[in-house]
Amino acid sequence: MALDPNYEDFQRLSLRFAGTLGASDPFGAARAAVDFGHRYSQKRDTLPQTDEDRAFHLVARATELIDYQLPFATDASAPQTIAEARKLLSEALELDPECHDARRMLSAAQAPTPNEYHRFLVEGAQEVLESCGRRRDAVTGSDELADVARTLAMRPYLRWLAAECASSLICGRYRLTLQEGEEALAVEPEDPADVSLTLALTYAKLEDEEGLRALCERADERRGPAWYALARAALAFKREDRDEARAHIARLLALYPNAGTTLARQDDLPDGVFARLAIDPGTEDELILATSEATVLLQEGCDSHERGTFGWWVANLPEVTQAQARELAADPSLGEGQK
């Protein structure tokens, strides 16, 4: 799932390197491929690259700090991690003023409110589209490598739209979320940014069962089944069909490790800044991420328990509490930091 900056960095440099090779010597190309792998991992600076490539590499390094190290940093080390990431992103913009990933990530860190960040994304989208479009149109050739290069040229715009879509959901602009999600799917129908997962939550928020059904007919539900199950459970709960809602929660308990603990805790995690966090499918982390993004559904309509009515109902289902008890008995560390 999700867009991995390290893999994209590898793709960018491999395309640049491939452009230096002759097509008439397959054995030489094979040797060159081995040489590229070694140089990429050991001597990256010796590979042919542009300032645009160097800037994206800095973005990939900043992503590792912000999205994957900062959430686990101590209070003492967090400021240094943040400062280092901002420095990398600023350097990326110096190398490539049209490094839109860096510009977006800096804004995410600096915007005083979610609404301010949302406004930044909405106002900047057209400029990013035009910039990425120019780079796409500058790619020559009609072979497979050229097609990949054109796709990569549009990826910053795709990530911009995906961030805009997620931001609209957070800010309660649900119709705009649907519009932005469809725009992202038009850029890449294969949906590498997994905007369909955001759309599933949005349809549940709007209580639009037909919209969710239509989405599921064209989306691959094997990519992120937790999002679809939570959306369907929320819809069933809203129409007071508790049996169907419980069936969807039961599916989560069967699909994911430590699902009882995850559904009981309902931790709210920081969003990935580069893109939705890259996690392995079917893992505990996938359900944790889905539950966090489904906060808009779980915390809707706070009751006397200071928790959303749907979220409280899920956390207190007998099958959830029983599963959590079994999981804690097997691994007491799961209870650390319990709310």
Predicted regions and their residues:
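Solenoid-like repeat scaffolds
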Residues: 47, 90-95, 130, 150, ...
